[in-house]
Amino acid sequence: MLYPLARHFLFKFNPEQAHDLSIKYLPRLLGTPLDCFFRHSLPKRPVTVMGLYFANPVGLAAGLDKDGECIDAFGAMGFGFIEVGTVTPKPQSGNDKPRLFRVIPAEGIINRMGFNNKGVDHLVAQVKKAKYQGVIGINIGKNKDTPIEQGKDDYLICMDKVYDHAGYIAVNISSPNTPGLRSLQYGDALDELLAALKVRQQELAAQYKKYVPLAVKIAPDLSLDEINQVAASLIKNGIDGVIATNTTLDREMIYDMPHAGEAGGLSGRPLQHKSTEVIRQLAKALDGALPIIGVGGIDSAMAAREKLAAGASLVQIYSGFIYKGPSLVKEIVTHI
């Protein structure tokens, strides 16, 4: 009820300013009378996926809390899991501003942030401080100045540092905003990366005496053949889950709207059906071999149900959350 007022206020700022304000002040509201603004007590909808217990199947997608500075505040909203990041070995500022745009008529967002983050050490410190009892996924990527041929090393560095603190680790090879990154989704490059990650996962599992699942995040802009190849590689390399999908480069749904010409990845409602079709095709190719986390344009319980019906076991929200607010979590969990 209060969120439309808050959104009206936040939308007076440019999108990145609004995001930064939210990340700065949300944690400060916890434990004050104002935390009733977003705190929700939700019905239990427990599921077990990748060997992990989730109080409900609705998660926060990576990108909103890149540095893990709002975990407890988002946890109070009722999320069954929270994915922080994308984080890189070294801090980096990301791409030049402006780099975040609202496509309000379509309830979409275009971003070309470029993995701006404070580095993996800072993120781990934030995760260690968090009191949230749900599953925390940590999304890892490569630094922009790391040559793509050496990208594997960045993922392994991050994996080493986050392993003992993550519920699961998400491997981001599908952001359109880091040059060359999406090339890691194809053929030998994908196999080589996944094989190296799997070996390191097994080494770390022995070291820490616990198994932390690996999930790979893929793009929506893949052909059917490419989806089938990705699925085969995930199975072959023993990956535990797949997150479908990241943002799209496609502008067909918003071609005549403000900011349609901006470079970057499009998320929100315009991505909804495209990502669902990828999930459907991926589920067919995987044939139950590993679970899918469905993300892309979920802005209602019905949209979440469509993702689950297409083959997802869990769902994540981001852009829908920006437009609808914390009540979207309650709506989905209650009516899913």
UniProtKB/Swiss-Prot annotation:
Alphabetical list of InterPro entries matching this protein: Aldolase_TIM, DHO_dehydrogenase, Dihydroorotate_DH_1_2, Dihydroorotate_DH_2, Dihydroorotate_DH_cat, Dihydroorotate_DH_CS
Active site as annotated: 175
Residues that coordinate or bind substrate: 66, 111-115, 172, 177, 246-247
Disulfide bonds: none
Membrane topology value: Peripheral membrane protein
Residues noted as binding FMN in the record, renumbered to the chain: 62-66, 86, 139, 172, 217, 245, 268, 297, 318-319
UniProtKB keywords: Cell membrane, Flavoprotein, FMN, Membrane, Oxidoreductase, Pyrimidine biosynthesis
Cofactor note: Binds 1 FMN per subunit.
Known partners and oligomeric status: Monomer.
Family: Belongs to the dihydroorotate dehydrogenase family. Type 2 subfamily.
Source organism: Aeromonas salmonicida (strain A449)
Full protein name: Dihydroorotate dehydrogenase (quinone)
